[in-house]
Amino acid sequence: TGPIERNDTTTVKKHLNVLDANEKHIYISVSGAVLALAEQKYPDRDYSEMKKILSGQE
């Protein structure tokens, strides 16, 4: 959860690169929930790049 809340896109990309398809699906599902909480906690942060990464657009 740390890299999502910190908006650490580099770490999230590294995580996704080493996971198999099933693990990646789980990681992305959980990360979406964490991202929603982070956006509420830190409304001034721009999480648009993180959203792209987690949606597979990055």
Give the residues covered by each predicted segment.
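NAD(P)-dependent Rossmann-like dehydrogenase/reductase catalytic/cofactor-binding core
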Residues: 1-58
